[in-house]
């Protein structure tokens, strides 16, 4: 399993976007990452200027969003949807997407994934697919 460090994950996003903007060939995962960065112009300055942002710690104080974490969760959700893991995720996403735009539906998945990961960390367990899917059902 690929388990990058914080810096490796951040550098991956920066490099994928840089290659995309330069018109260089991208791996399938880099293509997904670049497309997700493209959906978030509010993060372009962060991604395009790693010398200013790569080492920065983002805290929840003041409602600050960690753009690297947000994009990494987007990427995780995209991978989950590709393989319908956990089973039923794609169907839940389609229900959500039927009631809002696709990007908003993706954000609902990200929020539920974040809640599921937070709960697993708090309890000292692995992520619970039932908790994840139940969260999505409540949002549909």
Residue ranges and their predicted role:
Residues 29-96:
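Aromatic-anchored, charged helix-turn/loop surface patch used as a conserved interaction hotspot
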Residues 118, 122-140:
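Glycine-rich, aromatic-bearing surface loops/beta-hairpins
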Residues 24-26, 105, 124, 128:
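Short, surface-exposed helix-loop/turn micro-motifs enriched in polar/charged residues
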